[in-house]
Swiss-Prot record:
Keyword Cytoplasm: no
Family annotation (PANTHER family): 30S RIBOSOMAL PROTEIN S18, SMALL RIBOSOMAL SUBUNIT PROTEIN BS18M
Gene: rpsR
NCBIfam families: S18
Subunit structure, interactors included: Part of the 30S ribosomal subunit. Forms a tight heterodimer with protein bS6.
HAMAP family assigned: Ribosomal_bS18
One GO CC term, this protein: cytosolic small ribosomal subunit
Residue spans crossing the bilayer: none
UniProt keyword list: Ribonucleoprotein, Ribosomal protein, RNA-binding, rRNA-binding
Name of this protein: Small ribosomal subunit protein bS18
Biological role: Binds as a heterodimer with protein bS6 to the central domain of the 16S rRNA, where it helps stabilize the platform of the 30S subunit.
Species, as recorded: Sphingopyxis alaskensis (strain DSM 13593 / LMG 18877 / RB2256)
Top-level taxon of origin: Bacteria
Amino acid sequence: MARPFFRRRKTCPFSAKDAPVIDYKDVRLLQGYLSERGKIVPSRITAVSTKKQRELAKAIKRARHIGLLPYIVK
């Protein structure tokens, strides 16, 4: 008998002990959570927790406002 499909539970990359701190000045970290068009990738794809997704979105928006990240990529 075949095993039923089992979906592995993803864990938040920011919840571990040695996890990076979400900072608006850390452009390299923030770019990993943007699509190739510059949009914020949803947490169901990146497996980021709800609390950390809000922090991440706020940091990305802050970095965009001061010019560290582009609003859109053509």
